[in-house]
Amino acid sequence: MNIPFPFSFPPAICLLLIPGVFPVSCEGIIGGNEVAPHTRRYMALIKGLKLCAGALIKENWVLTAAHCDLKGNPQVILGAHSTSHKEKLDQVFSIKKAIPYPCFDPQTFEGDLQLLQLEGKATMTKAVGILQLPRTEDDVKPHTKCHVAGWGSTKKDACQMSNALREANVTVIDRKICNDAQHYNFNPVIDLSMICAGGRKGEDDSCEGDSGSPLICDNVFRGVTSFGKCGNPQKPGIYILLTKKHLNWIKKTIAGAI
């Protein structure tokens, strides 16, 4: 199946989606703990050639990362806890339309956001619910406690996918630290549209299979998992901040969709 993409992007300066690589060696939540089944009702499992995750933000819209590979015939599974078998509470959807943020830059990962319009609308149940977008576009201050969920490896040296949804606690790190020579060294630049966050000496982190997962800080949806180095404390997880510009794009795209 070929997923349709809109053709109304601004020219030249805004790059179209091309498959990106999460620069890591394995997939999934590093460390963390398994969550109680169906307690993260907003989580969307995007199952194609590779796994990604996302957040259900309306009955037929999922927000994820632009670099997620949608080749093949991907499905969006809502209400999932296990990746290995179908559950009674699962709701499975094909993707009607994939709309990457028009200024996504696959080299720097700036604007690494993507909206997926589902074929059909989700039914709200005890396993499926909507994650509200933030009401304000405030920055997230250093030392803020956050959490991120996903499906994947529990150890950075073991790349076997986990069967269950797991969650890691991470703490926001000052961008000056993330950009210094001991961390990303401005390659790429961690700018004001990104959040840098890591766990206990790299023991808790997000990873490739978690791309697109929502970052929740103080019970507010603040960012989308973009890239990192899977538990490497020198390369903490980077999340796309839901800025005013990003939120306006999300709302206008959903309002203007057919």
From Swiss-Prot:
It is an enzyme of class 3 (hydrolase). Keywords: Cytolysis, Disulfide bond, Glycoprotein, Hydrolase, Protease, Secreted, Serine protease, Signal, Zymogen. Residues 27-28 form a propeptide. The active site is at H67, D112, S211. Its EC number is 3.4.21.78. The keyword Protease applies. Gene3D superfamilies: Trypsin-like serine proteases. Glycans are attached at N169. GO terms for biological process: cytotoxic T cell pyroptotic cell death; granzyme-mediated programmed cell death signaling pathway; killing of cells of another organism; negative regulation of DNA binding; negative regulation of endodeoxyribonuclease activity; negative regulation of oxidoreductase activity; positive regulation of apoptotic process; protein maturation. One of its GO terms (molecular function) is serine-type endopeptidase activity. GO terms for cellular component: extracellular space. Homodimer; disulfide-linked. Interacts with APEX1. Abundant protease in the cytosolic granules of cytotoxic T-cells and NK-cells which activates caspase-independent pyroptosis when delivered into the target cell through the immunological synapse. It cleaves after Lys or Arg. Cleaves APEX1 after 'Lys-31' and destroys its oxidative repair activity. Cleaves the nucleosome assembly protein SET after 'Lys-189', which disrupts its nucleosome assembly activity and allows the SET complex to translocate into the nucleus to nick and degrade the DNA. This is Granzyme A. It comes from Bos taurus (Bovine). The lineage of its organism: Eukaryota, Metazoa, Chordata, Craniata, Vertebrata.
